[in-house]
């Protein structure tokens, strides 16, 4: 569903008013049409009039689509690895871990800053966490968000036991990152 211009630009005014460094646009879905990308590019150009850094969580892009957004002024893209290569098939069946890594590398080659991290608490092992962090080190993103699972009713991980996610455990993971 397309967010209204009023909401999007109103949020951008707030970023400017509060002197925040960046405005992040989060989108959901797998793949966007060229028309949707052009629409987003127009909106980014409008937002850039505020001298605000723009970040977008948009999923997979073609190189053509990424260039359109780069030319519009998009600064940073969030594309998380989410997990380790070996655990990834347990949480995602629509695409592969390598597709995520390749998408990030393509975006980096076009000059985007990258925000990429993962989610802890989905049933992965400690070795999986270390493997994900080592892959992130190789990718070398500008920002590494580490998220901790909060099970949501109605989702695949709704019944996941997160008792291991104590404050101490979470701090250890963050220290490794």
Predicted regions: what is each one?
Residues 73-76, 169, 173:
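Glycine-rich, acidic and aromatic/proline-enriched surface loops and short helix-turn segments
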Residues 1-9, 15-103, 113-117, 142-147:
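Core AdoMet radical
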Residues 162-170:
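Generic long, charged, amphipathic alpha-helical segments
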Residues 25, 49-51, 98-156, 170-177:
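Conserved C-terminal portion of the radical SAM core fold
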Residues 67, 90, 126-128, 155-163:
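Short, well-ordered secondary-structure micro-motifs
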Residues 29-34, 94, 120-125, 152, ...:
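Short, small-residue-enriched loops and turns at beta-alpha junctions
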């Amino acid at each position: 569903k397309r967010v209204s211009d009023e909401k999007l630009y109103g949020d951008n005014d707030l970023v400017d008013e509060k002197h925040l460094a960046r405005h992040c646009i989060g989108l959901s879905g797998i793949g966007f049409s060229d028309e949707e990308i052009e629409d987003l590019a127009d909106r980014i150009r409008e937002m850039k009039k505020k001298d605000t850094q723009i970040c977008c969580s948009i999923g997979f892009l073609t190189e053509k689509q990424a260039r359109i957004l780069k030319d519009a002024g998009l600064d940073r893209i969030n594309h998380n690895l989410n997990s380790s290569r070996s655990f990834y098939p347990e949480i995602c069946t629509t695409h592969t871990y390598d597709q995520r890594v390749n998408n990030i590398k393509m975006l980096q080659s076009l000059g985007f800053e990258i925000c990429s991290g993962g989610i802890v608490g989905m049933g992965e092992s400690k070795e999986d966490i270390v493997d994900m962090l080592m892959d992130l080190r190789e990718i070398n993103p500008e920002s590494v968000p580490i998220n901790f699972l909060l099970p949501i009713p109605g989702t695949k991980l709704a019944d996941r036991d997160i008792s291991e996610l104590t404050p101490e455990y979470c701090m250890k993971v963050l220290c490794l990152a």
